[in-house]
Regions:
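Conserved short alpha-helical segments that host acidic/polar catalytic motifs at enzyme active sites
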Residues: 1-216
Length: 216
């Protein structure tokens, strides 16, 4: 757990984990949760989601086919991927780009899910220059494969889908609340009548910044 953040992880059914940790006794302005069935990695509590580091809380649905390239990249900066889950390298990429290199969270997301070169070639000139620099300078941070990611941090909450939208990611709003989930039905269990609901576009980050402490 990081500052002002708690993480509750275990191997088991989500409802049992919630009961064990008595989550009904906690209050927070932001929650991330994930019932994960590991496909290519062992099922153990260290790989359970949310995957946390310092003030990062990350949940991820999918498979990172660029894992080895991404792992070699972050290891140049002193990170070590030992926890047998590809979500680990996603977490280290965000930590490297935002905390250590000072980039904005949404800029880091644009690096991880950068557009294809033919899409960049069709962009307006100024935007084309920006994405050309990002793809060139951070080519080893580009994530390939089907994925949907939620990133919670002190900066805010970010949702990101792979460029081809091979994994489902839905967003909804009601009042001052925003919801993200892999399926619309999951959102409607918590919020049966959202005012807005839509699919998150592939490769387009949605960022919900947190209010300043005094404004909450």
């Amino acid at each position: 757990s990081g500052k002002n953040m708690g993480a509750f992880k275990a191997v088991g059914y989500p409802e049992d984990v919630g009961e064990y940790y008595m989550l009904e006794n906690y209050k927070a302005h932001t929650w991330t949760a994930h019932g994960r069935f590991p496909t290519n990695t062992p099922g153990w509590w260290g790989g359970a989601h949310p995957f946390t580091l310092l003030d990062w809380s990350i949940v991820h649905n999918g498979e990172i086919s660029s894992y080895d390239a991404n792992r070699r990249y972050v290891e140049q900066f002193g990170y070590r991927c030992n926890l047998q889950t590809d979500t680990e390298v996603i977490t280290y990429l965000f930590d490297l780009l935002v905390r250590r290199q000072g980039l904005r969270l949404d800029t880091a997301a644009q690096i991880l899910a950068a557009p294809e070169w033919d899409v960049i070639d069709r962009m307006p000139e100024e935007k084309q220059k920006v994405y050309t620099v990002l793809r060139t300078a951070y080519s080893s941070a580009l994530i390939n494969g089907p994925f949907s990611i939620l990133v919670g941090s002190k900066h805010g909450l970010l949702a990101l889908n792979d460029r081809l939208k091979l994994r489902s990611l839905i967003t909804a709003e009601k009042g001052n609340k925003t919801y993200f989930a892999s399926e619309e039905s999951a959102i409607r269990i918590i919020c049966p009548d959202p005012e807005k609901i839509a699919a998150v576009d592939g490769g387009t980050p949605i960022f919900i910044p947190f209010a300043r402490e005094g404004d909450r």
